[in-house]
């Protein structure tokens, strides 16, 4: 019997972890892959891992550790022209056959009709760096490959940030 106390409806997990900014944003100047960043408190820049990237890395880890229970759900391309979408194929799988659909939820659109959606029980938010990004860059060139045919190397720069998130 409940005796008047409310039961918890959710569990929240908050964690701090050290990582590199693993997801990239648009390229700057053609050959500089940038990290995802946001500006706060006037002019301080912080990198972040998007919730899409967090979901990706979490699912990939679960799939590697528990492959039989966390197999990837199949996807289909639906729609036509500029209205094409890639989505889970819920006509052939469901929350009982694929833990991914149960845990993270889904939205399934049907052209011209109301879509079907299921809110996942695992909610994920973006991970924002606890330390500011100070413009760190990695400079690379393919010297080894360019040397083989006797051509010039192609320089590539990329933004980097290691922080606690």
Regions found by a protein language model. Give the residues of each.
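RNA-binding basic/glycine-rich loop and surface signature characteristic of RAMP-family CRISPR effectors
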Residues: 1-165
